[in-house]
Amino acid sequence: MHRLLSLGLCNLLSPSILARVSAMSIIGRRGIHFLHKLNAENVPGALIEHGQSRLIDASLTLIRESAKLRGELVRALGGAVASTSLLGVPLGHNSSFLQGPAFAPPRIREAIWCGSTNSTTEEGKELRDPRVLTDVGDIPVQEIRDCGVEDDRLMNVISESVKLVMEQDPLRPLVLGGDHSISYPVVRAVSEKLGGPVDILHLDAHPDIYDAFEGNVYSHASSFARIMEGGYARRLLQVGIRSINIEGREQGKRFGVEQYEMRTFSRDRHFLENLKLGEGVKGVYISIDVDCLDPAFAPGVSHIEPGGLSFRDVLNILHNLQGDIVAADVVEFNPQRDTVDGMTAMVAAKLVRELAAKISK
């Protein structure tokens, strides 16, 4: 009946109204960014370009000055060889399913400082000490996209922001996603800034190594293909894999990726809990997709995949890792799928806390 009424209504509407309804349906799926693009043809191209450049310059200035202030503080306190600094990248549009990870950075920050826990990590480091953890804020991703900035340029903004943090020695970036597409511009920036490749420890339910998932070279399912193509990593170890198809395995072989699947984790455990990485390269990069964890521990993710790592499995791997960690990210927490008490936010926050302790020295 509803379908018949719908068909009847369509017959009564003019083609122009139907076109507008169709356009609004597309806008609903793609967001306000697409609405701006619909009107862009009525605005001079030079005006759009100038406006985009001004907003990007302002965004980079904010990150630059924030990082400079934190760097000066850490250097004034003295004694730090490496100090973790948070950088938020609230980006979700490259997700193949849900875009909720765009809302994750503020939820993670809130959970880091939640009154239900203290500010000391398991290894005894005090997060309130700026030499252990500072925060330079978020890249205004949505505002940049609302100006019509495409992904090529947006990825460059992310890379440049990471480099601005790294310029303030001894700050090292710990990036809060966002979907997993952010790892590509972050790793690229780290490798370019340090002048060579890194070793990557990647914890995830998925290999994220499609050539171009659904035609999107910047898809969150393709980030590690871009990283390996660019020569930004020497070794890529993927741990926690339990959702992988033929292309994922073939791409892994193509790039020489070391894939450790959950079905063999009991056999691989000793090796993975005693990793030594980064020798002969510029250091170690750690990328943690929250869905590497079993959904019993972290239900607030876009792609729920049972049979994952326990939280203690992940901490054992991190705590025992030997190597100089130069940067890291925590991605794919989706607050829109979290429990009412914010369980996954607390899980993501503890991952950040323990990573901060591991990076800082």
Please report, for each region that a protein language model flagged, where it lies by residue.
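N-terminal mitochondrial targeting presequence
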Residues: M1-H33
